[in-house]
Amino acid sequence: MILQNKTFDLNPNDIAGLELVCQTLRNRILEVVSANGGHLSSSLGAVELIVSMHALFDCQKNPFIFDTSHQAYAHKLLTGRFESFSTLRQFQGLSGFTKPSESAYDYFIAGHSSTSVSIGVGVAKAFCLKQALGMPIALLGDGSISAGIFYEALNELGDRKYPMIMILNDNEMSISTPIGALSKALSQLMKGPFYQSFRSKVKKILSTLPESVNYLASRFEESFKLITPGVFFEELGINYIGPINGHDLSAIIETLKLAKELKEPVLIHAQTLKGKGYKIAEGRYEKWHGVGPFDLDTGLSKKSKSAILSPTEAYSNTLLELAKKDEKIVGVTAAMPSGTGLDKLIDAYPLRFFDVAIAEQHALTSSSAMAKEGFKPFVSIYSTFLQRAYDSIVHDACISSLPIKLAIDRAGIVGEDGETHQGLLDVSYLRSIPNMVIFAPRDNETLKNAVRFANEHDSSPCAFRYPRGSFALKEGVFEPSGFVLGQSELLKKEGEILLIGYGNGVGRAHLVQLALKEKNIECALLDLRFLKPIDSNLSAIIAPYQKLYVFSDNYKLGGVASAILEFLSEQNILKPVKSFEIIDEFIMHGNTALVEKSLGLDTESLTDAILKDLGQER
């Protein structure tokens, strides 16, 4: 759906009017996010910046590019989606990120960090070639500047001098504490001997002036302070303005006017407060970055915490248990210590934990080097972000067969974050790489055993995946067993057809097994466990069964059924195999159960499909 109409007239000369608009937007964001969940604190903090952008620029002539775009809620509200905003992150509702198919005002799809400047450079090149008026305007957070792609784009932009405005929304906090030398270097400039000596001399001179002009000392000091952090960007050929107050509409608008007139690359450094306007969230950065539904008055979650551990918790608890006994274990993550559960390792063993910032490629390559030196790096990473490091996996880990351990969180359909965050690709691209061992647990107990197996596996890289939230298989349905390289586990032998589950697909297959049993159809159930190497005894295991049905939460192309069919082909075995994996399209956002139902992957739909394949009807 394309939403064309705007709902607000924004006069850059009417600051009081713009302040009312900002308050209206904040109220709406709080109203909807408290009901639906979403990215709250960054969206609240960026309101004045976005209102100012819209007040001065036509975003269809000057494309607005939102880095990651989780902070773009105010933009959505200003571009015809005020009423429909109530459907934010809901199935078939508005996306939580910018999405061109949703609105003509959303220039580019976003969800992963640090791409905005690169996109902007591409737009600027195209505008130059077309001799088009206008310039790209990128809004990016301080966490975004820790990624290599930001510097790659900045390097070209500074050299070619394309007209472009970048607004650095500096709220002093990305999802977790910002990591890296740049932010430290900028702050060190303020503390360096040249700056300190110069400031001391200036203050000494100004102190001799009459008291009536003493205010000059503080004003001069502040002015010098504003110039200093820009040295880094100025040396790259980027005009730097700031820091400015990112909640002062007058200051933002005047600065944007100046940047517009320069017709060169400009970085505006705006300091904001995450959670601005909602006292409970102000200053509590990580807790309020991404939230579920909550009570607006108290800030308390509307969802009670499950007594069952999440897969992330089961993983992190086991890793911590092993780390107590094995000093060679180290934890590595790319700006997601809390999300991946590695924050527990930070607290217990800070010297053995490495947050490399938004630098997935560096995470994998540096981990490979640690593995070469005899350490056991557990790289804890979301499936959707692992794809950013594919070359490092191939070139730096697998060619030399270095035993890094990839703990792939949020594998499968993740729900409300949608296309940019679904964890559906890792199975297909990892199984194409020589020397990679790939396996998956079916529940929390086997996940713990997967971590133990990975810790002991020292001959090659290995990867194991687990879902967000919870496994489909309830705890205790099957006795947990340890992992043995390349061995599957036949959980139920009796039946004429065989249901094969991989990872979270075991739980899905088990539910179908129970549903078919009610139809007097007995099914055997196999937990494949290892995708690579696949069980060499698989041909004997499947021999008694007429048909095979494969369940796994990854893309069908290059997926689990493909691996099984390749194996059978090499063995010259003809056996009907039907895949219940994900179809070849990007999967929309929404409640996971509703998304699965729309794909025909709920228990009822799967049961009907098998009945139909068997020539029976429900």
Task: Specify the residue positions occupied by each region the protein language model found.
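Nucleotide/pyrophosphate-binding catalytic subdomain
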Residues: R28, S43, S52, T298-K305, ...
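Helix-enriched interaction subdomains in cytosolic or periplasmic regions
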Residues: P293-D297, I433-G476
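Conserved short loop/turn motifs at secondary-structure junctions
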Residues: A35-H39, L140-S144, G242-L249, I381-L386, ...
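Cofactor-/ligand-binding subdomain signature composed of acidic, glycine-rich
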Residues: M1-V32, I280-L296
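Extended, hydrophobic alpha-helical segments in both membrane/secreted and soluble proteins
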Residues: P136, L140-A153, G341, F353, ...
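Cofactor-binding active-site loop characterized by glycine-rich and histidine/acidic residues
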Residues: L18, C22, E31, L40-R160, ...
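Thiamine diphosphate
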Residues: T87-S118, L129-L133, D159-K287, S301-T318, ...
